[in-house]
Amino acid sequence: MSGNVCNRCNDGLMVNYPFLSCQKCIYLAKKNNKCLGVSIKGKHCPYKPNSNCGNIFCKNHTNQFRLHGKAHTHKLCSSGNDCFREDVTIKNLKQILPIDYPFAQCETCRNNERSYFNNKQQRVKQHNAESKDTMICKKCFVELPTNKFPKTSRGKISHYCKSCFDKRAIIERNRIIDPIKERERSKKYENRPDIKQKRKKYRQCKVVKIRNAISLKKSREKLRAADPENYLKKKAEQQAKHRQKYPEKNGITTIRYNTISSDKYMRYKSVAIEKGLEFTLTKQEFEKLVESNCYYCDCKYKNTINGIDRINNNVGYILDNCVTACSMCNNMKNTLNVETFIVMCMTIANYFKYYRTDIFVNVFNNYESASYNNYKNRALKKDLEFQLSNKEFKELQQKPCYLCGRKSNDKHTNGVDRVCNEEGYIPTNCRSCCGDCNYLKKDYKLDNVVFRCAFIALMHKNNAKKLQDDWKPSRFHESNDKKLSKEENREIKLSIRENKEKQRKKSVEKSVSKLQNQLNRLLNKNTIEV
């Protein structure tokens, strides 16, 4: 532009020179009857000038003609759109802006571009929320599979593809290259009148907010101190209503427990205290265990972490007594020892012909089946359909267990199990089942249980002989002698609650003190009027 160089020959121009081209180029263009305009690539226009453009520029370079003579005080909008529409017959006309206008594009083009970009970002956001398989990058708008997107430092999936993510990381690292220049730029920005006014308005609003926050905290403390029981009861009712209103937020705690090792660590520690068990695992040891594959089935879920199982249920959470276990294996094992659990799984896998081995019948415990009336009453309590007759019930008891093949005898009687736990006690859904297999299956689907037993059997097939030799009897739901009594548990909970209450009061006092200091600092500023 003017003040720099000529747009045709690149010779230097004077500072306040009003034209785009030097006098020599203007003279030659008029002499040769050629347009004075220059294309974007820097080539001279080969067309003849138009009378509507002062016989200097052709019709294609109307914008340059409009700027001709005032290039030292004005500039053209740099947008690719036609934003000046006073003359409809001529296309691609640009707005002429003052030379000191802070932006390269006019306000209309900036609003259009902003609106277009916001709509595009909204479509990307909607797609990323609805689609689970693919995501669109917020920067380059490339659609890729979800697993191609990197994770942030907090473990969440980034909204940017790998290329854009790396570029942003480099920009962030090199953001402050020269601290002195950055400080000068910051001072210049802060001294702007509009920024000063914004800061003043913000401080005034901040004073009101801080005062409200202090009064709210103090009033809550007074209400709680006056009648703690009714206060907590009222808050509990409010939370219950909130949970009913927003049911999608209820599973956040479960998600955190299944994905964040620190949350799981604290939960395991508190359960160990309630059960009266020793807990010596460090956070690092715990994290290493839960992020490993399951010791029993060698499985690891994609989006969740595993848990921990104690080899000897009479010993606490000591490193030598702990192995990694997925939730299904942990629930199936219950209080059985390792040898009994694995051999039971081998027996079930063998019965379904997924694994070949000897039948370890001796590891199964003897049970006395519940009576027909007990089954019927339990079905009524659970609101389940019950269509079995007494004769059908007894016939089922005499059949072999449908999971391990064990039969009833003088010391043991099989019971009845529902294959699909969502259906009731109807003849097509009932099978004969021994007590151990019934406890092991729990509420899982039959196929899942059988396949999991097959995984466990194949995982430990090389140790089958050793497992049988080391086997010692164990049962489901064995009582824990070290478990605290209800009174002891209540005392521990009360002490924990008292400590939490003390910490809460300290936190409130600290928060109020911090807010008061902020308020005093704001009131002491000379720029604010209160």
UniProtKB/Swiss-Prot annotation:
Q: Which UniProt keywords apply?
A: Coiled coil
From the record, what ranges are coiled-coil?
A: 485-529
User: Does this UniProt record's set of keywords contain Coiled coil?
Assistant: yes
By what name is this protein known? Answer: Uncharacterized protein R423
User: What is the scientific name of the source organism?
Assistant: Acanthamoeba polyphaga mimivirus
